[in-house]
């Protein structure tokens, strides 16, 4: 039930979600996507910098952080986080830096970061010693993986996102759909049956055509958790399939080469769903299951999609859907908790005409908005409340807009210090005294890829959008040289 706008303030321990007063935390945001994604999306290499949202944990004098990134963190990026985002004062900075270690693996291969770490014996030994220095050790990972499980065994640290075998089963497309059905959350037409041949998929699409979900198109989703951002989805024209019987030849949208799709279908399987034509909104809910099994709804967002892929979000989600999203996320989390999941999870929804809110995917990992809400809570100094709102010290709501910018020609000419100082000079960088402005993330990708993320916070949605537009124009447009 929604509250009456109570501000959820945090003490120092709660503010940064700290639970282990004497601990070593290894921050490793490894993206265990298919190799094709890691090769073709260069900024993913720098997205490990999202883990810098946890630097506030250094307020606890018993905590040591070891941050692992694919590329070295620029000193200006670190300085921006410590001073501007988390506001460590000068007397505290020396001790904070002493308890902070930044590491990169020796290999620069386009493979998941945790795999590269595991292959670096010297780095693993450094981590093992760091964990041994304190009573407890945690791996703050983006998602579960075999490499992270093994890294936990070799260092003595506990991965935050649980066991990979569990996540592979229940975080797959079929597993997620089954979870939603168990939780009583509405989903698109189709079943959670895993199909492993083109003939089985064709038959499932024909069966779907005969049911109540008689849309013109169907969606085939590769089942494995490695296929994210809709890369493993294939949109099928049902009429064409009915006349030709050729699955791949009937595809309106397919992002993989035909042979790779067929190989993945045979090895990992796929599910078939109706394709929803009348989508007006794409909200999402983020939850977390504590070690004792308690389910917490963290936040609800409206997603900004580009080509079916996540490209940003707005907070909070539309109030028309927020209570229903909150309830669905909680019920989904209760099913997951009962099965044994611990850690983060996200549920993606669509609003489909008269059918309303439908869950289309579950992710048993941190998700696109995970670091965003953590940055926002750190900047504001409060958690999202039971009413689904984030409020400042004065009790007024705070809204934010998060987006990704990929402009190689212009952003590629900037470095982290220049980007931060340009926003500061124009009064756009987030100011703690006003509670408004723009925060920057993944600054390391500026020079290399022309990519950066920004989150604009303000006291109204319109003002947040205005800050975001102004910051984007400033970073990508002409600017007088000093």
UniProtKB/Swiss-Prot annotation:
Pfam families tied to this protein: ATP-grasp_3 (PF02655), PGM1_C (PF18105), PreAtp-grasp (PF18604)
Class in the EC hierarchy, top level? ligase
Question: Any idea of its EC number?
Answer: 6.3.2.-
Involved pathway(s) = Amino-acid metabolism; Antibiotic biosynthesis
Provide any one GO MF term from the record: ATP binding
Q: Name one GO biological process term.
A: L-beta-ethynylserine biosynthetic process
The knockout outcome noted for this protein's gene is: Cells lacking this gene produce lowered levels of both L-propargylglycine and L-beta-ethynylserine, that are terminal alkyne-containing amino acids produced by wild-type S.cattleya.
Q: Which reaction does it catalyse?
A: L-propargylglycine + L-glutamate + ATP = L-gamma-glutamyl-L-propargylglycine + ADP + phosphate + H(+)
Q: What highest taxon heads this organism's lineage?
A: Bacteria
Keywords, in A-Z order: Amino-acid biosynthesis, Antibiotic biosynthesis, ATP-binding, Ligase, Nucleotide-binding, Plasmid
Protein role: Involved in the biosynthesis of terminal alkyne-containing amino acids such as L-beta-ethynylserine, that are produced as antibiotics by S.cattleya. Catalyzes the ATP-dependent ligation of L-propargylglycine to L-glutamate to form the dipeptide L-gamma-glutamyl-L-propargylglycine. Is selective for L-propargylglycine over norvaline, allylglycine and the standard proteinogenic amino acids, except L-cysteine which can be used as a substrate to a lesser extent.
Q: Kindly provide the name given to this protein in its UniProt entry.
A: L-propargylglycine--L-glutamate ligase
Organism encoding this protein: Streptantibioticus cattleyicolor (strain ATCC 35852 / DSM 46488 / JCM 4925 / NBRC 14057 / NRRL 8057)
């Amino acid at each position: 039930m929604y509250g009456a706008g109570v501000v959820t303030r945090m003490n120092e321990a709660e503010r940064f979600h700290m639970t282990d007063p004497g601990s070593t935390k290894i921050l490793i945001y490894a993206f265990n996507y298919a190799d094709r994604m890691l090769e073709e999306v260069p900024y993913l290499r720098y997205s490990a910098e999202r883990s810098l949202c946890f630097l506030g944990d250094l307020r606890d004098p018993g905590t040591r952080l070891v941050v692992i990134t694919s590329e070295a963190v620029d000193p200006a990026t670190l300085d921006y986080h410590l001073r501007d985002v988390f506001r460590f004062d000068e007397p505290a900075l020396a001790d904070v830096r002493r308890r902070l270690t930044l590491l990169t693996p020796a290999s620069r291969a386009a493979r998941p970061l945790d795999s590269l770490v595991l292959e670096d014996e010297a780095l693993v030994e450094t981590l093992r010693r760091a964990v041994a220095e304190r009573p407890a050790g945690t791996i703050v990972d983006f998602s579960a993986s075999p490499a992270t499980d093994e890294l936990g065994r070799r260092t003595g640290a506990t991965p935050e996102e649980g066991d990979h075998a569990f996540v592979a089963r229940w975080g797959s497309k079929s597993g997620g759909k089954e979870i939603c059905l168990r939780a009583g959350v509405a989903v698109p037409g189709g079943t959670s049956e895993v199909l492993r041949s083109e003939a089985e998929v064709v038959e499932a699409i024909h069966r779907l055509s005969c049911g109540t979900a008689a849309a013109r198109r169907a969606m085939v989703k590769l089942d494995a958790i490695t296929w994210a951002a809709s890369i493993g989805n294939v949109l099928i024209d049902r009429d064409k399939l009915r006349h030709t019987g050729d699955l791949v030849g009937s595809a309106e949208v397919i992002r993989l080469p035909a042979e790779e799709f067929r190989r993945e279908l045979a090895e990992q399987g796929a599910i078939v769903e109706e394709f929803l034509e009348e989508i007006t909104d794409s909200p999402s809910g983020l939850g977390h299951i504590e070690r004792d099994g308690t389910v917490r709804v963290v936040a609800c967002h409206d997603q900004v999609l580009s080509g079916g892929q996540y490209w940003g979000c707005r907070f909070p989600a539309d109030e028309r859907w927020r209570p229903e999203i909150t309830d669905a996320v909680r019920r989904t989390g209760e099913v997951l908790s009962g099965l044994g999941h611990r850690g983060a999870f996200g549920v993606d929804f669509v609003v489909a005409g008269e059918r309303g809110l439908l869950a289309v995917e579950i992710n048993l990992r941190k998700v696109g908005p995970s670091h965003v809400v953590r940055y926002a809570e750190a900047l504001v100094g409060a958690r999202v409340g039971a009413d689904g709102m984030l409020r400042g010290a004065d009790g007024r709501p705070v809204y934010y807009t998060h987006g990704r910018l990929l402009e190689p020609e212009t952003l590629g000419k900037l470095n982290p210090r220049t980007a931060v100082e340009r926003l500061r000079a124009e009064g756009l960088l987030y100011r703690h005294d006003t509670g408004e402005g723009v925060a920057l993330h993944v600054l390391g990708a500026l020079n290399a890829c022309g990519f950066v993320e920004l989150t604009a916070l303000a006291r109204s949605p319109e003002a947040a959008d205005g800050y975001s537009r102004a910051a984007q124009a400033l970073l990508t447009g002409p600017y007088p040289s000093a």
